[in-house]
């Protein structure tokens, strides 16, 4: 019992160490990002600025709103900058509990997941934002003019960028479910038509009402789903070979 208790205490000590290092990394990233927080926000605002009518500007309606907006920008950027160090600390904590064959998958998993998340965010920023903002601006009239607030715009952008980043994680998510036996390639292929319908409905809601834009948004999502099916097939074949060899 004493040895088990000591082992448990060692785990808590190790967890505390990794958390402290992770928080310090985020703190350093936050401090560095705050220096250029205005530039970061200006970069996020470029798609909206291009969609706004001439001479239009963003506003803040409470005295501390701009200050807290820049703090939030700094925190989000700090977490992003510190994410490699945070993931490394997670790896150092869980690695001793993994088998050698499991450790081989960790680095590729982290790299691929990170790249897919960045690709999703970039897709949202460079593709969806410009067309989406133009669509929203189309509702303006001579009597109704846009006056977007800093705080609301940052929240809106953050939500969409994170959403698109998570959507682009679809192949990794499906691969994980396939390994657990929850889904397989046959099931994914069988439901392809329903997934395509959902994708186009989502594209129709998020983009202006023209076919070209909707297709431009739907194609990457359809491609990700097809990649997921291919990965599920590969996992299924590997499982079948492993069972045959027993």
Predicted regions and their residues:
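Membrane topogenic/interface segments and analogous intrinsically disordered interaction regions
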Residues: 1-246
